[in-house]
Amino acid sequence: MKSFFKIFTIFILLLNIALGNPEKKIVKIGLGYSGRSYDPHKHTDSSTLAITKQIYNNLFILDNENEVKGELIENYSIKNNTIEMDLKKGILFQDGEELNSEIVKKSLERNKSIPVTKVLVDPIEKIEVIDKYKLRIICTTNVDILLHNLTHSSMAIVKEDKNKKLIGTGAFKLLEWGTGEKVILEKNDNYFKGSPKIDILEFLTIPEAPNRYIALETNEIQIAYDISSIDVKAFKNSKDLEILNKLSYGTDFLSINTEKAPLNDKRLREAISYAIDKDSINEVIFENTSKVANSIITPNTFGYSNKEEKKYNLEKAKQIMKDYKTPIEIELWIYEDTSKYQMAQIIQANLKEIGIDVKIQTLELSSFLQLTAQGKHNALIGLWYTSTGDADYGYYPLLHNNSRGGVGNRSFYNNQRVNTLLDEARKEPLKEKRKEKYKEIQEIILDENPIIPIVYKTYNIGINKNIKGFKFNPNGNHILENIEY
């Protein structure tokens, strides 16, 4: 009798497969932080956008050469400060409604009403709907800047349903968000680029980098974002795992609150800059896999200038510090991240050598973002992705007076020359002249040190060797629509 039931069970399983009910293909991805919301317009942190990138699409994306090309756009033309664009026809939202010009207009206007993304659509003066599939955007600035801005993952085109729930056109649709620690997406069979080969994506929050590696090794997950440089070595001896590492658009930096004494003193910030041993940070924390930074923006970003940074010079730093007779104490804020804590420890030791006592304060990410936006800090260690591949998105949010606080300028820096150069660069039609303005900005920042760039981030992705079709994105929002497992 037992043999009969065993044979019957196997028969039922085979019958399910034959009838088109195979086991679902699931891929699990480990993130360092929880996604904050499925709304890409309101939260631009890398974990949120890593997830929402799979749910929504952009009008434009960047190719491997940092050139803008259409995603939802079939073709476009530029005349002076005006862009005319034709939408691809037949693209469906996940509720079955077709993409049209009115929805695109509403989505961009929504971006304009939200402070954190407003900076990206500021160049838009007016949006005109010509017909169901054609739009005209009139800009107040250089059109090229807007095109690059529209590639940012927070510029995804969204549609609100009758319950105000956001819907996208992406390869996967939201099944479960919960607290953000476990997010489940299911494939969109009507995806305009073709139905994904994976049925379910699960994004799991695994805060510690070594634990992400262990989860990958035990096949609890199949893809791990942001593998630590120390764990990279382990991949060399693995027959099942491989590491993908490329220069990202990200820069780790020290941001100094220029409104708080004594750090409002330019000379003190200069001493701090000379005292930080960036080479040691790269060697000890990143095992020389990253690159010492001389700018907020990375070398693969338009507008980058290879200006020599202030080299580590302890004697110069000590010489400047002779002017300060009273002890100096500062708090250095970081969010929960192993490499940020290690970086803070090295900076703490560096500054102790010149008489500055640094106390490290570790905060949960949401508290860190909220309190630093309010200017409660002395200094912080941050990471910024110039995700558009254009210097405007590196410099304008981090340095312009209009961007103070939550938009990005957490150093509360206000330099009229820098403000003017940024405004002029947005209006300048010639790329070479724009580059000259960004070069001058970089020189001013290296002189005044409101932000001290430390290293350019190399992004390490650990994947199971059975994963095929993974597409690396230098902004950290990797594309999973074509993966197979």
Regions found by a protein language model. Give the residues of each.
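N-terminal lobe/hinge region of extracytoplasmic solute-binding protein
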Residues: 30-80, 109, 167
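Gly/Pro-rich hinge or "lid" segments in bacterial periplasmic/extracellular proteins
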Residues: 43, 64-65, 143-196, 200, ...
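Extracytoplasmic/peripheral linker and loop segments enriched in polar/acidic and small residues
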Residues: 357-368, 396-465
